[in-house]
Amino acid sequence: MLTIKNWQLLSENDKKLCLSRPRQSSAIKENVLEIINQVQLSGDKALYDLTKQFDRVNLQYLQVPQETIEQANIPQNALNAITQAIGTISSYHQSLLPENTEISTASGITIRNVYRPIQKVGLYVPGGNKTPLVSSLLMQAIPAKVAGCPIKVLCTPPDAEGEINEHILVAARLCGIDTIYAIGGAQAIAAMAYGTESVIKVDKIFGPGNSYVTQAKTLVAIDANGAAIDMPAGPSEVMILADTEANSEFIAADLLAQAEHGPDSQVILICDECELANQVNQQLEIQMSYLSRIEFIKQSLANSRIIICSNQSEQLDIINSYAPEHLIINRKNPESWVEKIVAAGTVFLGSWAAETMGDYVTGSNHVLPTNGFARNHSGLSTLDFMTRFTVQAINQEAICNLGPAAMALAELEGLDAHANAVQIRLNTLGD
């Protein structure tokens, strides 16, 4: 069960350790670099070889045939659920579409903001046949579609027969994606970043993954010849803030829902007193007994803990210091806490706000910053699939009025060619 820590009794160093996340092996970076180099050098051949090495599959093709996508079929109840999710996710991301605005900053000057969709985007969905992560696809494909990205490609690992789960194919089809590659892992990220004979090189890569995928995204993002990325999304995490009135059964269920993602996931409960902590631990044991991903859960809980802290100011400091991917405020008057939160990927309010709902059907995006990146990153949105540039119009009146100031600043910085570009125009107007 979860280790219980009394915050007031911890030293400053122990407090830091209490909020530390599982560390990634330094060997991963070297392994991923080797994979990226192999894809860059050998292209499609490397993808076939690496898939055989890591997935133990002899692929017959890299790109899923169009006929296979069109003929994919799933049970009606699954189709209904996907359709409902598409509706709410589309509504939310439509609301985020920006408007092209124009402002006059001075007489004779107008500046217009213009938004454009990124032309080529690559979506990554982890998991093979046993775990078709349809929701991960929807959370990327829908904002890409809403933004108007003309080229959308999907990479996802194949199953043992080299095929893609039909739930993924149907969801992709419903979201307007017809270019799908049966490739997973760091090699998929490398293929989309640099392109191969078969895989389209994209401008930006999206999607979560394991430590290899996250490392690959980080490496291609710092290479000028690679591709931009959405965010460095690592292992999933949740932090729950609960008072004495919170339902321990609900809390345990939310902790387990996050813990089952993988062995490096982390869950933290902050509560006022030991009684609730003990009740939650009891519930964890009860609920774990009938869950399927028990090995993942056990490893995750070993990285996790319960923090006893009765001081609300300190509770707030813990939250903002940790900057959780998911924050559940399961206590009285949860709304009153929101204005004090400065670092969180997404916040769930009240006892009925199961984090699972946000993962699938509320419409909000579940691709969120982890590992403390919520301090300076936001969850995925329509804007991430767009670029913005400004259009500046300057007439004669403006250059007469503001040109001398521009020249003075240019000369202050020792850039006389800058000053000259204005002076020549002023001279022309003076003739």
Swiss-Prot record:
What GO molecular function annotation could you give as one example from this UniProt entry?
A: histidinol dehydrogenase activity
Could you give the cofactor binding note from the entry? Binds 1 zinc ion per subunit.
> Which residues are catalytic?
E325, H326
Question: What PROSITE patterns would the database entry show?
Answer: HISOL_DEHYDROGENASE
Signal sequence span is: none
Pathway(s) annotated for this protein in UniProt: Amino-acid biosynthesis; L-histidine biosynthesis; L-histidine from 5-phospho-alpha-D-ribose 1-diphosphate: step 9/9
Cofactor(s) of this protein:
Zn(2+)
Q: What is its EC number?
A: 1.1.1.23
Give me the Gene Ontology terms describing cellular component.
cytosol
- Similarity comment text for this entry: Belongs to the histidinol dehydrogenase family.
Q: What name appears for this protein in its UniProt entry?
A: Histidinol dehydrogenase
UniProt organism field: Legionella pneumophila (strain Lens)
